[in-house]
């Protein structure tokens, strides 16, 4: 992993505030435009409304067991949103089977909708992927993906909500 990848951040933050700029999408995948919103931080509410596994993964940086969630091998056209805040994250057009047992994508739907931070847990350096709007842990990005980006956004299925295109 290059240092540039490890420190890259796509979140457009307004200086001195807790505002972030994201690209909004309709449920049929059409870009609605950029908007600036307050970052969502309501951990007590997350615990009440998420399943125990979704809370552990998204709020406590957990990882679901590979091949354990039904969404890992979904192939129909659609949009993947954050299970916590509904932010649009990935278009199914960029999803591919990485053989890992987790949903994998070669790019986010809009670079500003996710951000990446260095993750040094478990004695290794990786790049964690989070939702820009609510800071939910989504998974990690690796440099072993397919063209055109060479990236593998390896996401936890429980962190994503799939909306099929109509």
Task: Give names to the regions the model predicted.
Residues 13-28:
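Short N-terminal segments immediately surrounding and downstream of signal-peptide cleavage
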Residues 1-12:
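N-terminal export signals
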């Amino acid at each position: 992993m290059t240092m540039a990848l490890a420190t890259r951040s796509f979140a457009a933050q307004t200086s001195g505030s807790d505002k972030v700029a994201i690209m909004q999408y309709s449920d049929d995948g059409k870009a609605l435009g950029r908007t600036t919103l307050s970052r969502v931080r309501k951990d007590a509410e997350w615990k009440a409304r998420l399943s125990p596994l979704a809370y552990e993964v998204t709020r406590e940086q957990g990882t679901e067991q590979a091949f354990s969630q039904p969404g890992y091998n979904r192939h129909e056209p659609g949009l993947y949103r954050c299970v916590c805040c509904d932010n649009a994250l990935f278009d199914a057009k960029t999803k591919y089977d990485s053989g890992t047992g987790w949903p994998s994508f070669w790019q986010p739907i809009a670079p500003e909708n996710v951000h990446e931070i260095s993750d040094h847990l478990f004695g290794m350096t990786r790049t964690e992927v989070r939702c820009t709007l609510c800071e939910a842990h989504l998974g990690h990005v690796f440099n072993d993906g397919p063209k055109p980006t060479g990236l593998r956004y390896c996401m936890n299925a429980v962190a994503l909500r799939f909306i099929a295109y109509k």
